[in-house]
Every structure is written in structure tokens, then in C-alpha cells.
A protein has these predicted regions:
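Non-catalytic, beta-rich accessory domains that mediate macromolecular interactions or localization
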Residues: 20-23, 73, 88-89, 97-100, ...
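Residue-level preference for alpha-helix termini and adjacent loops
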Residues: 24, 48, 56-58, 70-77, ...
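A hydrophobic, small-residue-rich beta->alpha segment in the mid-to-C-terminal subdomain
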Residues: 86-124
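Cysteine/selenocysteine-centered motifs that mediate thiol-based redox chemistry or coordinate metal-sulfur cofactors
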Residues: 14, 113-158
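Structural signal for hydrophobic packing residues in well-ordered secondary-structure cores
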Residues: 28-45, 111, 115, 119, ...
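Structured beta-strand/loop patches that form or line metal/cofactor-binding pockets in enzymes
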Residues: 39-85, 91-92
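Solvent-exposed, charged interface segments at domain starts and junctions
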Residues: 1-18, 83-93, 141-145
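Charge-rich, low-complexity N-terminal segments
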Residues: 2-44
Length: 158
């Protein structure tokens, strides 16, 4: 099971790393992905859809915190897509039912993997998505931190 490295405030996801890129594409908004996909396709490169974007159920697995064992939390709806852009394959899986974002994300993934001329702009946008995602995570953590229970303090009061 792969650990979620982005949970650390210091970790900066690398859009050139495919695993990180998958996470960033999944977090990116549909309009941004579609815009980049359209720009990549402007030159009419050979494109074949290897997996049509269709919503599916996926078992979401988390790690149980006490014994650190995998735990099936439940099924979630995701939309995967896979393309071949020239000789390069691209894949994306986005949360929910969103065929356009999944197909666009797969095209974006292939473009970055192939070092398309739009790669610098795509990478910059994905890095900005990662920065926003980390900031949101820090805000959420700060808001929920005051609900932490200190069991040692509770035991001392009894």
C-alpha cells in the first residue's frame, strides 16, 4: 500500500513523478485540465482512447490507526480514462462522475510524460494545485486541532 506523502506540509509533489502527477491531476479542476488538453490537441497529434471515461465504483482503503492494518472504508465513485498520445500513454482517475475531467487528465498526463511543448505551463499549474491543496489541508488541520482529546489530562482529573 502506498503511503500518502502529500500529508506532510513540507512535501512538495513533483508533477514529473507519475504518482504525484496522478494525485495532482485528480485534485485539479475540470476547466484547467480541459484547457490544457485542448491546447495539446491543437496540433492534431495522433490520439487513441484506450479506456473510455466511465464512472466506476472503487473500494477506498485506509490504514487502521492502532494496528496499522488496511481497512476497507467503502466504495467511492471515480472516473478513470486512458489514452495514447502519439507513442505515450496517459492515465487519469478523478473523483466522482466526471468523464470530461478524466479524459482531459489522461491527455495532460501523456503530454507531460512525452515532454510536450505545453509541459512547463502544465507543470506550473499542477504545482499551484498542490500548493492550494496543502494550504487547504493545513487550514482543515488547524480548524480540527482544537477538538483533540488529551487522554492523559482526563485521567489526571479523575
Amino acid at each position: 500500500m502506498r503511503s500518502f506523502r502529500c500529508a506532510s506540509a513540507e512535501y512538495m509533489p513533483d508533477p514529473h513523478d507519475r504518482s504525484d502527477r496522478f494525485e495532482l491531476i485528480a485534485a485539479c479542476d475540470e476547466e484547467t485540465l480541459a484547457g490544457f488538453a485542448n491546447e495539446v490537441l491543437e496540433g492534431d497529434p495522433p490520439l487513441s482512447i484506450r479506456q473510455d471515461p466511465r464512472p466506476k465504483l472503487l473500494m477506498q482503503q485506509v490504514q487502521e490507526p492502532v494496528e496499522r492494518r488496511p481497512f476497507n472504508l467503502g466504495e467511492v465513485v471515480v472516473t478513470p480514462a486512458e489514452v495514447e498520445l502519439g507513442d505515450t500513454r496517459g492515465f487519469a482517475m478523478v473523483p466522482g462522475k466526471n468523464e470530461r475531467a478524466a479524459l482531459s487528465g489522461a491527455i495532460v498526463d501523456a503530454a507531460v510524460a512525452a515532454n510536450h511543448e505545453r509541459t512547463p505551463a502544465i507543470v506550473e499549474s499542477l504545482q499551484a494545485t498542490g500548493t492550494r491543496q496543502r494550504a487547504q489541508h493545513r487550514r482543515s488541520w488547524a480548524e480540527s486541532r482544537h477538538t483533540t482529546v488529551d487522554f492523559q489530562t482526563m485521567e489526571e482529573q479523575q
